[in-house]
Design a protein with these regions (language model features):
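Class I S-adenosyl-L-methionine
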Residues: 87-90, 114, 118, 155-158, ...
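Acidic, Mg2+-coordinating phosphoryl-transfer loop and its flanking beta/alpha structural elements
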Residues: 145-178
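Substrate-recognition "cap/lid" segment bordering the active-site pocket of phosphatases
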Residues: 97-144, 151-154
């Protein structure tokens, strides 16, 4: 099977899309590239996800998110150091692996997240939107690296034989990726 990167490299006589074929990177969106929390604060008048859920309930927050439709998901801002991480991984064998959502936002989140990737990343970046975060582990293999900000996703990924990087900052994730890719 011919990969798009191979065709582009041949057409442009370049190795701009060079990657380490031994590894495939799966990168989460919310909390890694996208600032979900900032988006929630914009919807709730500055109240954080956690505080809003504590005071008004989980269902109330998801109701507000749903009222804003897929446009809310597609216009979420980049996380502060998201561009730095994306600049490092974009020319590697990378797939966006993100969860649709947990509270009745499935179709809206799927449409919005795919649109966000199209507008902010590239039309050629594969995007997989799972029904929930636990479904991410179905893509784990020994040479597959998951970058995710949720410890439970990393633990499930590793339990299925994949390599997991718990994302806290772009710098930390890049350092861990460099160590893995050097092996």
């Amino acid at each position: 099977m011919i990969k798009l990167k191979d065709i582009l490299n041949e057409v442009f006589d370049t190795n701009l899309l060079e990657n380490n074929d031994d590894y495939r990177i799966f990168c989460d969106l919310d909390g890694v590239l996208v600032d979900f929390d900032k988006g929630v604060k914009q919807l709730t008048g500055g109240i954080s996800f956690e505080d809003y859920v504590k005071t008004k309930g989980y269902d109330s927050l998801w109701s507000i998110i749903n009222q804003n439709g897929s446009i809310w998901w597609s216009t979420l801002p980049w996380i502060a150091d998201g561009h730095k991480l994306w600049s490092f991984i974009r020319n590697k064998d990378v797939t966006i692996l993100t969860a649709g959502s947990t509270k009745n936002t499935g179709k809206l989140a799927i449409e919005g997240k795919k649109d966000w990737c199209l507008k902010n990343l590239s039309a050629i970046v594969p995007v997989i939107v799972t029904n929930n975060s636990h479904d991410k582990q179905q893509h784990a293999q020994p040479n597959h690296i998951l970058i995710d900000d949720l410890p439970s996703n990393i633990n499930e990924w590793k339990a299925k034989g994949g390599i997991g990087i718990l994302h806290t900052t772009a710098e930390q994730t890049i350092n861990e990726l460099q160590q893995i890719l050097r092996q």
